[in-house]
Amino acid sequence: FKRLHETVDTCFSEDFINIIEKRCIDAAAANVGLNVHFSYTDNDKVIRESEWHFKTFDEYIELFTDYVDTEQMLKFSDSIMQVWVFPDNGINVGFVNGAECSRGTHIRAVRNEINNAISAYLLSKEKIDITPKNVDGKYSMFCTFHVNNPSYDSQTKECLTTVVEKFSNDSKYTFKVPDAFIKNVLKSEIVDIVIDWYKQKCEVEDQKTLRKLNRQAKTKIRNNDKFIDAN
């Protein structure tokens, strides 16, 4: 920067610096036990620096405590994945092999099983017919995966494309969200949120139907022939 007669501030925006620091935090979170140091300097002057080390991925999630209700968080894990879900609006925070990857087959595989289970439960127990797709936005998820030879839709590795059957190199491994975890989800506030959404949706549809019927009734009245006295 000295040779260019520039400073860090003129070359990098504050938003860019924040993104770089977040990448450092994410790298430490996805690689438990690794020390990651972030240093933002200008002409040897330290402007901002931080060091990150997580003993567990749970400690990373605790950074979001102002946003996440950890008491309502549900968790499961197996040989290739750790997953946490909680009532929310459908955000995904995911990692694959230590790199941030919040879209793709790993996210959909977990969500599909949860969504299908909630949809089937509501139809059976509450007589509520709601599609799995409409369940999707009622909870958020943190996850970290170790996928064998992962493939992505681009070099930025933002979306995993590896098919579920190839997640593990263990021929005996079968991807499945545990039944015990599903049972806990069905007892959670997530289901209540889905039911509330469905009821609100029905109320809106009923109001639309009522307004339509009122318009039709008014139209019929206006179109009636004027009364003609028989005398």
Model-predicted regions and their roles:
Residues 1-231:
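GHKL-family ATPase ATP-binding module
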